[in-house]
Amino acid sequence: MPVKDSSSNKKNQIGKLSERQRRILEVITDAVSLRGYPPSIREIGDAAGLQSTSSVAYQLKELEKKGYLRRDPNKPRAVDVRALPDPIPSKPGRKPGPKKSSVAISPDPAETSPTSFVPIVGSIAAGNPILAEENVDGYFPFPSEIVGDGDLFMLQVEGESMRDAGILHHDWVVVRSQPVAEQGEFVAALIEGEATVKEFHSDSSGVWLLPHNDAFDPIPAEHAEIMGKVVSILRKL
């Protein structure tokens, strides 16, 4: 039985890219080179002419299958470009442009401090991972000494229920993902598909999510899903 040349097959497979897939690779490598972290799903879609996040997710999976990308299943937005396709052959009479480099430009360590790129989460659906691709709108850089470590994400506060605690309408909160909370901690919780920020409280009468505004009532939390603990607040003045 003849033995197939697997390396030759792989080479043929890795060359089969559409123009759109080439564009997606360019967008990712350019973003990593310029700012040190990959673009969001929506940024990729805008640059590649894809309207839906599911279409972008599909193209990323195809690029991963073809060996151009490697993705960390535990970090939905971690994307590592493994290879770049050969340049598209130029038309007769034209010189090919310079070949792009896939090497990311590293900032001078002396001018930088440890930074956490925190995903900005838009709408959250019950039962879906918080950091699922379709939930993340982008990233925001924070000094690690401010937000700490762990799996972090950002939510924008809607409403005045935490006003007296200094958490105002349209503030951004940085949340460390964890399924449990301690007494008195501010948490982000999911109730009937809606995210809310409240104080966690437990006593003989049950578990409650407490507002910090007398105009709002405590919320029973028996059926709430604790998404994490609020660790920082960001406000635009």
UniProtKB/Swiss-Prot annotation:
The record marks 126-127 as: Cleavage. Residues 1-12 have a biased composition (Polar residues). Its EC number is 3.4.21.88. It comes from the Bacteria. One of its GO terms (molecular function) is DNA binding. Residues 41-61 bind DNA. Residues 67-80 have a biased composition (Basic and acidic residues). Residues 1-20, 67-112 are annotated as: Disordered. SUPFAM superfamilies: LexA/Signal peptidase, Winged helix' DNA-binding domain. It catalyses: Hydrolysis of Ala-|-Gly bond in repressor LexA. The active site is at residues 161, 198. The keyword rRNA-binding does not apply. The keyword DNA-binding applies. One of its GO terms (biological process) is proteolysis. Keywords: Autocatalytic cleavage, DNA damage, DNA repair, DNA replication, DNA-binding, Hydrolase, Repressor, SOS response, Transcription, Transcription regulation. It holds the Pfam family Peptidase_S24. NCBIfam families: lexA. Belongs to the peptidase S24 family. Homodimer. Represses a number of genes involved in the response to DNA damage (SOS response), including recA and lexA. In the presence of single-stranded DNA, RecA interacts with LexA causing an autocatalytic cleavage which disrupts the DNA-binding part of LexA, leading to derepression of the SOS regulon and eventually DNA repair. This is LexA repressor. It comes from Corynebacterium diphtheriae (strain ATCC 700971 / NCTC 13129 / Biotype gravis). The gene is lexA.
